[in-house]
A protein has these predicted regions:
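A generic structural signal for short beta-strands and their flanking turns/coil linkers
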Residues: 28, 47, 93-95
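A short beta-sheet element
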Residues: 33-34, 53-116, 120
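Flexible, active-site-proximal loop/turn residues at the rims of small-molecule/cofactor binding pockets
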Residues: 38, 77, 151
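A short glycine-rich beta-alpha junction/loop motif
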Residues: 90-97, 109, 129-159
Length: 187
């Protein structure tokens, strides 16, 4: 394990979205909001807002989310992180930012687990700015937040193990839903 380095050393970039909300659209690319990023590190796209095709270029001027990017909430609801999946087309919503991992230096899955860790949470908490209405992570300081990460090959091995456990947990959750439904139908 190397000594702490700024998180920016592991990234190709750190970006936030526009500080506004687009006009409502019933279809088009996803406007990724806080509610779409779950506490357990997943994207929930069951209920999404959309941005129109005409407005999309304006909302992706700073960055277009790519598969493997790690999105996170930095204002109001904090400590939510998720990986952008293959096939996602959308833009960052208000109070959402992303880290584009450098695959030579960091495994995207390991980075997600690191961001969800208690030690990262405590470190972020020490930098949170408490506002009159909401708390926020100062994005201008985020790139310099310290991170002590192992070599990328070790990260991959750890992420493989943790991902396997996450898959088992998710599979068990689905089974529980099916069993509960079967029990309801029987009784």
């Amino acid at each position: 394990l190397a000594g702490p380095r700024p998180i920016k050393d592991y990234c190709l970039g750190i970006f936030d979205g526009p500080h506004a909300t687009p006009k409502e659209s019933h279809d088009g690319p996803v406007f990724l909001g806080i509610k779409n990023i779950t506490e357990d590190g997943r994207l929930d796209l069951s209920e999404v807002r959309h941005v129109s095709e005409e407005e999309y270029p304006r909302w992706t001027r700073r960055v277009i989310p790519q598969p493997g990017d790690v999105v996170f909430t930095y204002e109001a609801t904090l400590h939510r992180y998720a990986i952008i999946p293959e096939g996602f087309r959308g833009c960052l919503g208000r109070r959402v930012a992303l880290v584009r991992p450098n695959p030579v230096r960091v495994d995207k899955r390991y980075l997600l687990y690191f961001f969800l860790s208690r030690s990262w949470r405590h470190m972020v908490e020490s930098s949170v700015i408490t506002g009159a209405t909401v708390d926020r992570i100062p994005l201008e300081k985020f790139p310099s937040f310290p991170a002590a990460l192992p070599q990328v090959d070790i990260q991959r091995r750890i992420a493989d193990i943790l991902s396997a456990y996450d898959d088992l947990i998710e599979n068990n959750k689905r089974r529980m839903v099916l069993l509960e439904e079967a029990a309801r139908q029987l009784y």
